[in-house]
Every structure is written in C-alpha cells, then in structure tokens.
UniProtKB/Swiss-Prot annotation:
Positions annotated to bind substrate: 54, 141, 153
Name under which the protein is recorded: Glutamate 5-kinase
GO cellular component labels: cytosol
Gene behind the chain: proB
InterPro entries found in the cross-reference section: AceGlu_kinase-like_sf, Asp/Glu/Uridylate_kinase, G5K_ProB, Glu/AcGlu_kinase, Glu_5kinase, Glu_5kinase/COase_Synthase, Glutamate_5-kinase_CS, PUA
Function: Catalyzes the transfer of a phosphate group to glutamate to form L-glutamate 5-phosphate.
Enzyme Commission number, as recorded: 2.7.2.11
Keyword Disulfide bond tagged: no
Subcellular location: Cytoplasm
Amino acid sequence: MRSIIADSKRLVVKVGSSLVTNDGRGLDHDAIGRWAAQIAALRGAGKEVVLVSSGAIAEGMQRLGWSKRPREIDELQAAAAVGQMGLAQVYESRFAEHGIRTAQILLTHADLADRERYLNARSTLLTLLRLGVVPIINENDTVVTDEIKFGDNDTLGALVANLIEGDTLVILTDQPGLFTADPRKDPGATLVAEASAGAPELEAMAGGAGSSIGRGGMLTKILAAKRAAHSGANTVIASGRERDVLVRLAAGEAIGTQLIARTARMAARKQWMADHLQVRGHVVIDAGAVDKLTAGGKSLLPIGVVAVQGVFARGEVIACVDDTGREVARGITNYSSAETKLIQRKPSGEIETVLGYMLEPELIHRDNLVLV
C-alpha cells in the first residue's frame, strides 16, 4: 500500500502538544527543529505545507512556572498568550535555518463562521503559500473559552484543510494510528491501515480523552478526518515518534492509518455551512422527512418536524435529527425556534394562518441544506 501523501500537492500538517514539548514542560526546541527540517524537505519536493501546531499553553505554563495545567479559563488564556510568543519565535528561528519564512495565524471558529472573514483567511493563506511562506496556525485561545474547554487542533486542522482545499490532512500524534480497540486494554487490537473517512465503525473503535498536556483523543481525529473529507481531503493519522515520518510518508511509505475521502466533494458554500457554522438548535424530523432529505434532495417543510430543541433565530444553522438522535442534515432556518414550535406538523399552506405571515414555505430550503 502506497502512502496517499506521495501524490499530494498541498498538505495540512497538525503536530500535537506531546510532539513539540518536553512532556508539557516548555517547548522541545530540538523536536521543533526536526519538524522544520522535514517540512523543508517536503517543500523541496514541491509540496505546499500549512502547519497547525499546538504547544502554546504548555510553553506558557513553563514560562510562568506552573507545573500543572490550570483549570481556570482565565489562567489557560494567560498561559496561551505568554506561550504563543515563544512558539512563534522557535518556529521562526528553526525554519530560518532552511531559508524558509514563516507566518503566524491565530484563528477561532467564529472567524471561519463569518463568510467574509472566512474568504479573507482563505485568500491570506493561499497568498502565503504562493509566496513560499509556511503558515503556522493555532487556535486563538486567548479570546475564546469554548475552544479551550472542548476544542482541539485536530478539528482546526480539518477546517484549514477545507479552507485551502488541501489534498491531505496529516495528524501527527503519540500513537501509531487507529486501532480496532484500545491496545492498552485489548491485546488483540490491530492497527487499521486504511479505511473510508466517515465510516460509522471508526467512531466505535476510537474514544477516550487526550493527554493532560494536549486536548485531542483518537475520536477527535476520526471526526476531523470526516470533516476534511467534505472538501475531498484524505487524512493520515501517524505517530510523530517515527523517525522522519513526514519524509517517509512523502516518499510513499505507508505509516499509520490512512482515511480516504470517498464521498463527492461538497460545493464550497455547502461545505462552509456544514463545517464552519455553529449549530444553534435541533429539530427532530419524522421518517418521511428523513427520506425526502436523504433520497430526494428536497427542502425541509414544517410538516416533517415533530419536535424543536434549543433556541435559535431566523438565519441561524440548525441540525435535523431523526427519532434516534442521529444527525441527518443541517441548514439555515427560515423561522425561529418559537415560530417553528407553532408551525411544526403543519402544512405550509397553514403557516400564514398560524403566524399571521409566511416568510417562506420551507423551514429549510434545499439550497441552504447539507447532508452530514
């Protein structure tokens, strides 16, 4: 089996905290130097590389003299602010040894949820690649709280792959790849060499939290691969402990787990809706509506809605789930949650009678709806 990276032109490489720090006690300058050398080699082979790197909080903890990761959000944000300075400095100096310039870009999900800012970020990244610069991306933890609590750079890597239409997302971790079960508990667990990104059985195989220094477990990597596949990007999950892993992957050696994007690439706007807009609420839809959305490519009408969950406004993104709670689709709603509760199970012809007005006959028009 040949590595999919060998034939990839544009890569997004995500390096986890454990691979750039000394067990969370500050940055490992030598390790970062090795990553810079490998990426320089990839650049020499004609590949474009965007690097998504963790490590800011771990470096901030070291600089502030903290031995344990803090629990308070404001302290995590302070550590990120202090540590990001060191992270950028080390990468700049190590890449300079190879004659490569770097750029620091800090992003939040809110940046990518705004269409104008999304397009601006895309334009900036593509320009940097054209200029021969290696963009180094991290989440802007200093201004966001939910990303520190629940976010991870695996997800960010997938979103960046979508953003720049990367060919392959490479997630480097301290594990060899995805196993059929937890190898620490099941001696019969075997490495999954290749699978389809988004295959339901992968989520059952994965699970568990990340390390005390990092944030992402294997499940986040599987979900990241599923997101990356929306724009046609394949994913490789491999151990960053492997010697010259990036160079060997680029040479065609199969290392770790390859997750292949087998579904059709989404249209740019629908991919943006699916991955970059925050879901504000849910509607439970009946079996008939599920069939019309998944098989018929139809709009979602109020008559197909059986329940409304959460509070949302007109123009926000909501998820459509079946009676088991499985998400089927998501899209931009034409009605608020309060309005939807009044018109659920009603034919579209009765909307004006119930509300006194009719904005649209559909709850979600098919042009604003994407299957997930």
